[in-house]
Design a protein with these regions (language model features):
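Glycine-rich phosphate/pyrophosphate-binding loops
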Residues: 126-140
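Extended amphipathic alpha-helical scaffold segments
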Residues: 106-114, 118-123
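A short acidic, glycine/proline-enriched capping/turn motif at secondary-structure boundaries
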Residues: 111-113, 137-139, 173
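Short glycine-rich or small-residue beta-strand-to-loop segments that form or flank ligand, phosphate
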Residues: 101-108, 163-169
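Charge-rich interaction surfaces and accessory domains that mediate macromolecular binding and assembly
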Residues: 2-105, 120, 135, 174-243
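Internal insertion modules embedded within essential enzymes
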Residues: 142, 146-195
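Catalytic micro-motifs at enzyme active sites that drive phosphoryl/nucleotidyl and oxygen chemistry
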Residues: 87-94, 118, 145-156
Length: 243
């Protein structure tokens, strides 16, 4: 197994020792081999960094590493900025592991509202969520969207991507699996449009606030202050809703 890098150590020092031990069990279980083993191990440490100890301890390390590496393989090619969605029931002969649950993998630009929006899609389908893994990774891709490296120091500009894994109630009907995938793809597309519009609206609100201070209209100062305070309150509420 490759030794943890300096970046890995900084990452692991920010979480409880019990979680570090569980993550290292997952890393040891991977045994990917080949020239990209170091990348896979760095990926696993980042991937499970934010997962609670009880969720990690309740599952076999090999199953977790296989699911994560399936995510890494799935994300190897991402043309443009299009989100990726995969909904499947793991099979030992195809995926190298099995699960009593249906798995959902997504890869998208990091944006507000992602987890909540996907959660609502599951609620609409009456599907319970049993595990969420949702790291934000610094990703290096070439012009064709091919994954080159992970980490802020991978060389060249990195892009923040949200990689999400969900274990949900098992769905066995192939048509229902396809329907869920289409719904999730549409959901991620809607989030992208909403975030773009939301940012544009926030910029407009800030511009109006600035104009009230620099070039106030022909109103009483108290009225101007009331409008400015209202806009500041709206802007602050929008900001807090995505923190």
């Amino acid at each position: 197994m490759h030794a943890a890098t300096a970046d890995d150590n900084r990452l692991l020092h920010s979480i409880p020792a019990a979680r570090v031990a569980l993550i290292e069990r997952i890393v040891r279980s991977a045994a990917t081999g080949g020239g990209r083993q170091g990348l896979a191990q760095r990926f696993l440490r980042s991937y499970f960094h934010g997962v609670a100890e009880e969720d990690l301890a309740a599952r076999e390390p090999r199953g977790l590493s296989r699911a994560a590496l399936a995510h890494l393989k799935f994300a190897a090619q991402r043309p443009g900025q299009h989100p990726l969605v995969r909904v499947f029931n793991p099979q030992a002969e195809r995926d190298g592991f099995e699960s009593p649950h249906t798995l959902v993998l997504t890869v998208s630009d990091d944006m507000p509202f992602l987890v909540d929006s996907i959660g609502m899609a599951f609620a609409r389908a009456n599907l319970a969520v049993h595990l969420i893994v949702h790291p934000v990774l610094q990703v290096h891709r070439d012009r064709r969207g091919r994954l080159l490296d992970l980490g802020a120091n991978g060389g060249g500009p990195a892009r923040a991507e949200s990689w999400q894994l969900y274990e949900i109630d098992r769905v066995t009907d192939p048509q229902e699996l396809e329907k869920l995938q289409r719904d999730l793809e549409a959901t991620l597309g809607d989030v992208r449009v909403a975030v773009h519009d939301w940012r544009a609206m926030r910029e407009r609100v800030r511009a109006v606030i600035d104009s009230l201070a620099k070039d106030p209209p022909a109103l009483l100062p108290a009225e101007i202050n009331e409008v400015a305070h209202l806009l500041e309150w709206m802007d602050e509420g929008d900001r807090k809703s995505v923190v």
